């Protein structure tokens, strides 16, 4: 009796192909990045790259893409139209103007302290300036009583103010001095004492403005009169004789106009009445400027950018519907220029700095638009470090 031997059927091409496809899908499933959906949500379909990865449009070190692959233009247009009038007010381009070109560099105008510091409480008293200490260690008191604050009831003060003290040449003449006990004068010594009990000078807005306003009356005179007035000498002997005739007379307040204090006017920037007396100030700043790190500025309309949480998102930027243009400043080179020789063991390089800018972007699920902060290059800084 002969036994028949059963041979296994040969593998067909279809079976081999099916096995290959199954293996390929299995390997792809294990090597592909995990889906971006959380807690059973469907994978995100509107992202330039999965979380933790960089899209192919971004070069190494870049935080934005001007042209992103698979940019959802149609979806973004429909969502912008859904917003309606809000899109026109929320989507704003950055301007091309430079701050240095529009900044105001002139000397600020000096105003009355009352206009600079308005009263916080309407029912409270008006602001009469800060209570600074006098040059001799006292604290001036505020004037009491009502009336118009722009005018002083008593034109002469018992004790000189600090400004009058500086403009009167020290505040004393011929050895006279103020007595701190009786308020009188004595001829012994050269020191100045002020009665600081109740002899303080009240605030006067007229004198405040008079210090800083130039005297325009001399501008209207003839040039020869102004020159004669400046050249005319002062008879000092006659002035000393008049003071000796009245030794017991109290020391009067200096009648010199405080607006002629040239030190103060030079600080403010007011021109002198006589051009011959004008003092020229030499500028100490170097005329030219040089930068350590050269930069290139450009305005971009990014379609994808890296947000502050480290994820790449699609940014709303469609030329005809909605545009968000931002400024980027990139380092032109990696080495610092215009530097002196560095010590041994130190090197310098230009380092790119970034800032966060708030833009409107597309949500990962494509349902709506939202605002987010993205990183953009802002400046280039020269850093010196040890090797």
UniProtKB/Swiss-Prot annotation:
'Spaetzle' means 'noodles' in German. Neurotrophin which may function as a ligand for the Toll-related receptors Toll-6 and Toll-7. Binds to Toll-7 and Toll-6, and probably acts as their ligands in the promotion of motor axon targeting and neuronal survival in the central nervous system (CNS). Involved in synaptic targeting of ISNb/d motorneurons and also some SNa motorneurons. May be involved in the normal development of specific neurons at the neuromuscular junction. Glycans are attached at residues 195, 204. Residues 1-29 form the signal peptide. Pfam families: Spaetzle. SUPFAM superfamilies: Cystine-knot cytokines. The lineage of its organism: Eukaryota, Metazoa, Ecdysozoa, Arthropoda, Hexapoda. Gene3D superfamilies: Cystine-knot cytokines. The gene is spz5. This is Protein spaetzle 5. Detected in the fan-shaped body which is a component of the locomotion center in the central nervous system (CNS) (at protein level). Disulfide bonds join 293-350, 331-380, 340-382. It comes from Drosophila melanogaster. Residues 276-286 have a biased composition (Basic residues). Homodimer; disulfide-linked. Residues 291-384 form the Spaetzle domain. Residues 30-284 form a propeptide. Residues 237-247 have a biased composition (Acidic residues). GO terms for biological process: central nervous system formation; innate immune response; motor neuron axon guidance; negative regulation of neuron apoptotic process; positive regulation of antimicrobial peptide production; regulation of neuronal synaptic plasticity in response to neurotrophin; regulation of synaptic plasticity; Toll signaling pathway.
């Amino acid at each position: 009796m002969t036994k028949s031997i059963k041979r296994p059927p040969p593998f067909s091409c279809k079976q081999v192909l099916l096995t290959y496809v199954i293996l390929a899908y299995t390997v792809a499933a294990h090597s592909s990045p995990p889906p971006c959906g959380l807690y059973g949500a469907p994978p995100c379909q509107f992202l330039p790259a999965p979380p933790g990865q960089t899209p192919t449009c971004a070069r190494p070190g870049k935080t934005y893409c001007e042209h992103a692959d698979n940019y959802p233009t149609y979806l973004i247009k429909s969502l912008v139209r859904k917003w309606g009038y809000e899109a026109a007010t929320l989507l704003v381009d950055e301007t091309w103007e430079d701050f240095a070109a529009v900044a105001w560099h002139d000397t600020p105008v000096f105003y009355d302290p009352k206009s600079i510091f308005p009263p916080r409480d309407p029912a409270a008293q008006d602001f009469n300036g800060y209570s600074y200490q006098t040059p001799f260690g006292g604290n001036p008191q505020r004037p009491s009583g009502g009336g118009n604050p722009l005018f002083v009831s008593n034109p002469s003060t018992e004790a000189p103010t600090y400004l009058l003290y500086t403009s009167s040449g020290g505040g004393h003449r011929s050895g006279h001095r103020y007595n701190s006990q009786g308020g009188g004068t004595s001829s012994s010594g050269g020191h100045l004492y002020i009665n600081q009990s109740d002899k303080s000078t009240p605030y006067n807005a007229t004198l405040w403005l008079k210090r800083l306003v130039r005297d325009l009356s001399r501008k209207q005179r003839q040039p020869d009169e102004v020159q004669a007035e400046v050249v005319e000498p002062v008879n000092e002997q006659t002035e000393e004789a008049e003071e000796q005739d009245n030794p017991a007379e109290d020391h009067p307040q200096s009648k010199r106009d405080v607006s002629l204090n040239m030190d103060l006017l030079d600080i403010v920037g007011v021109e002198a009445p006589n051009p011959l007396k004008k003092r020229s100030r030499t500028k100490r700043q170097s005329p030219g400027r040089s930068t350590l790190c050269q930069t290139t500025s450009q305005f971009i309309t990014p379609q994808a950018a890296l947000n502050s949480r480290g994820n790449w998102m699609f940014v709303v930027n469609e030329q005809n519907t909605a545009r968000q243009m931002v400024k980027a400043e990139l380092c032109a080179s990696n080495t610092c220029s215009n530097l002196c020789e560095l010590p041994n063991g130190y090197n310098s390089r230009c380092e790119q700095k970034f800032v966060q800018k708030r833009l409107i972007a597309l949500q990962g699920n494509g349902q709506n638009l939202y605002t987010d902060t993205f990183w953009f290059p802002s400046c280039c800084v020269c850093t010196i470090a040890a090797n």
